[in-house]
Amino acid sequence: MKSAVETLNPTRVRLSIEVPFEELKDSLDAAYKKINQQVTVKGFRKGKIPARVIDQRFGRGAVLEEAVNDALPKFYTEAVNEGELNVLGQPEVDITELKDGELLAFTAEVDVRPEIEIPDYSGIEVTVDALEVTDEEVEKAVEQLRERFAATNPVERAAADGDVVTIDLQAKVDGEVLEDGVADGVSYTIGSGELLDGIDEAVTGLEAGGEATFTSQLKGGSAEGKDAEVTVKVTAVAARELPELDDDFAQMASEFDTLEELKADSRKRLETTKQYDQATQAQERVLEELLKLAEVPIPEKLLADEVQTRKHNLEHHQLGQMGLDLEKYLEIQGKTLEEFENETSEQAIKGIKTQFILDELVNKEKLNVNQEELTEHLMRRAASSGMSPDQFAQAVVEGGQVPMLVGEVARGKALAVVVEAAKVVDTNGEVVDLEDDEEAAEAAAETTEAPAEAAAEDKAEDKKAEEKNEA
């Protein structure tokens, strides 16, 4: 076999491959054997038909076609390895010459990873939010905890903001009561905004037994998006009573003996959360600067596939779980289809660039992934997918996507290398030490997925859906 590589552009090549006919012998033998098992000829046992009879009865062309189809992948792979090419996706193959007994010649055009020169990233400087926890934030956190321990007591008065009312609901569209538009005994906190628009105004001021009618656009169900005439009847009113903020509350709501200890713990938790957010912010901003420094050509077909994958994931997984279609989603977001497609394309370009650069950095820095790192990463991904580690691991293995997980961890480590070399300061001008924030680095790297990663997510989500249906 002879092969030659022609570079069409930085991301696409054409392979020209010539195969002497004697190198097709194994494929020709396999073709005769396959046809032998598929056909019957009177006078011959199945599988024992001579080659000359097959040629006479079914044509030499059918045999050659079968042999070529068998041989192409093998010779294409040999040519790719010989040319030391890092190919992306499937090739477009064109058979240019096929002379029986003499020669098979074909070309294969395929996308390849572009050669990328890693820029000097040591001079990157970024600014992040300062790690500050205010007294107001601590008070808010404690107040939220206090809300969780609120008690409700029945009252004989008109309902007011913050009260918990028990209500019966009936929705009509065009004068007809909807089959799924009746609900009794619903508990609702006035002012929470958790039900229909207009319900707060309707129930405020009503006592138990009181009734009101209002018009509201339905947020779900069989008549989603339509205006409905909603009748609400209050059957009970209860006032929420918050516990006193004192040491007794601290002992009831936590493992601490005093309110001051509870507040100190709340402050510490807020600091930890902000520390993680600060690290993630640093990685995102360092990554943005790195992308600005590097020239990364994007293969057109890879970009088109990635855009399609992102659209598919949004429509069939994320929106499907929320009961929305793309049209409704865009309406809620206030975006046109053109704006959505432009944004999706920009996100895809960023994702591909990020993967190319970080993968190149992994090779340059010779970064490896050990079993412990891979296991920890798998458990985090499983949790984010709402699956058990065993379920997620099975889906990944069945989809042949273990290398995808390894790549994610490696890219996270590569990004951490860039962040470590960068100068990160907060809005107060203080240098930020991001040492040991590897988990946040991985999280930032995972926000940019190439098609392989997105495909694995599809498989994991499909697996989860199948198990749910079987249950």
Curated annotation (Swiss-Prot):
Residues 162-243 form the PPIase FKBP-type domain. InterPro entries: PPIase_dom_sf (IPR046357), PPIase_FKBP_dom (IPR001179), Trig_fac (IPR005215), Trigger_fac_C (IPR008880), Trigger_fac_C_sf (IPR037041), Trigger_fac_ribosome-bd_bac (IPR008881), Trigger_fac_ribosome-bd_sf (IPR036611), Trigger_fact/SurA_dom_sf (IPR027304). Residues 432-441 have a biased composition (Acidic residues). The keyword Isomerase applies. It is found in: Cytoplasm. Keywords: Cell cycle, Cell division, Chaperone, Cytoplasm, Isomerase, Rotamase. The keyword Ribonucleoprotein does not apply. One of its GO terms (cellular component) is cytoplasm. It catalyses: [protein]-peptidylproline (omega=180) = [protein]-peptidylproline (omega=0). Its EC number is 5.2.1.8. Pfam families: FKBP_C (PF00254), Trigger_C (PF05698), Trigger_N (PF05697). Its main location: cytoplasm. Belongs to the FKBP-type PPIase family. Tig subfamily. Involved in protein export. Acts as a chaperone by maintaining the newly synthesized protein in an open conformation. Functions as a peptidyl-prolyl cis-trans isomerase. Consists of 3 domains; the N-terminus binds the ribosome, the middle domain has PPIase activity, while the C-terminus has intrinsic chaperone activity on its own. This is Trigger factor. It comes from Streptomyces griseus subsp. griseus (strain JCM 4626 / CBS 651.72 / NBRC 13350 / KCC S-0626 / ISP 5235).
